[in-house]
């Protein structure tokens, strides 16, 4: 039986293949009560970032002060920006059927799921990998595993963190480091092996 394109991607060494890293900022952490205000994705092909998607999103109401301080995003910046309903089709087209990577990716996917169910009537079903879980397994000696702390450990520039495009770019760079470490030490780099490692079964 012929394999589907998606199953082939999932068996590829991701250092040679294609994946998309996503990140978002929202008005809060409760998915049902919060809305996305900053959405980004970067496509990685053969270990190189080849394309980027980024947009601010108008949430429909004023954002909390703590979110302004965290992200640097203000209400004035969001006025006149597209709504999530307007940007969702372009975002989903950019992501395609690729493997999705994120730092604490489960939270991002919960938000995307909320919107795909609301506006598309279906769940977001792309396979996913979490750099937070993988970094804990691959680099066990780090003191902290926030995106900023991991990035600084590798000498990456972290000015502008907590903006979606910056965070997605840093996550991509960290994931490439994880893939390189796993490939050179253990000869693994496919989705299924990484998923087992996430779950502590490697």
From Swiss-Prot:
The lineage of its organism: Bacteria, Pseudomonadati, Aquificota, Aquificia, Aquificales. DNA polymerase III is a complex, multichain enzyme responsible for most of the replicative synthesis in bacteria. The epsilon subunit contain the editing function and is a proofreading 3'-5' exonuclease. A divalent metal cation 2 binds at residue 23. It catalyses: DNA(n) + a 2'-deoxyribonucleoside 5'-triphosphate = DNA(n+1) + diphosphate. Gene3D superfamilies: 1.20.5.140, Ribonuclease H-like superfamily/Ribonuclease H. It comes from the Bacteria. This is DNA polymerase III subunit epsilon. Its cofactor is Mg(2+); Mn(2+). Its EC number is 2.7.7.7.
């Amino acid at each position: 039986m012929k394999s589907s394109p998606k199953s082939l991607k999932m068996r590829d060494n991701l250092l040679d293949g294609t994946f998309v890293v996503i990140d978002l900022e929202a008005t809060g952490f409760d998915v049902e009560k919060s809305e996305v205000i900053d959405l980004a994705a970067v496509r990685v092909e053969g270990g190189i970032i080849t394309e980027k998607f980024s947009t601010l999103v108008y949430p429909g109401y004023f954002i909390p002060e703590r979110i302004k301080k965290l992200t640097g995003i203000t209400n004035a910046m969001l006025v006149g920006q597209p709504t999530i309903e307007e940007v969702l089709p372009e975002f989903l087209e950019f992501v395609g059927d690729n493997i999705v990577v994120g730092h604490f990716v489960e939270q991002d996917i919960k938000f995307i799921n909320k919107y795909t169910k609301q506006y598309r009537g279906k769940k977001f079903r792309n396979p996913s990998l979490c750099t937070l879980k993988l970094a804990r397994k691959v680099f066990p000696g780090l003191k902290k595993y926030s995106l900023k702390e991991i990035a600084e450990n590798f000498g990456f520039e972290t000015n502008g963190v907590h903006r979606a495009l910056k965070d997605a770019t840093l996550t991509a760079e960290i994931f490439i480091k994880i893939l390189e470490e796993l490939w050179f030490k253990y000869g693994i780099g496919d989705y299924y092996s990484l998923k087992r490692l996430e779950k502590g079964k490697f």
